[in-house]
């Protein structure tokens, strides 16, 4: 490559030194120690507690969603669409599976899953709902799914490459929530 100097003469550009891709040997050596930490290695860094807090808030969201879907399943059973009431149960079970996966990841990161019923609704991103009419139930569940989608999308962006295992978990859950939202949107349109 060349460039013109002030006098207009062409001069070669100096080569820019770039850092080569290389593994962090110190971190690899550190991984040989602290075996009681299991999968936790130094790369988790200072944000591990923040990730645990985000996961605990998502755990609360999933548990509130389980409770809302279960209530809607049982109270919608006598309403216009038994098929939708049954689907509420399917969604409740999916949300329970999400909660289990989140709790498991919290433990893997060295945290404790917070199942405290006293703080669930305060920590949850989504609201509990006691609607009596099927259409209102569908709408409440769609709102909750959309809130969860936004929360998971933001968490995935925040975590980035800091914790690829947690990011993949959240991406899997996000895909399920997006599917739930599409189903609810279709039922509302009927």
List the predicted regions and their residue ranges.
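Iron-associated oxidoreductase/ferritin-like identity signal
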Residues: 1-190
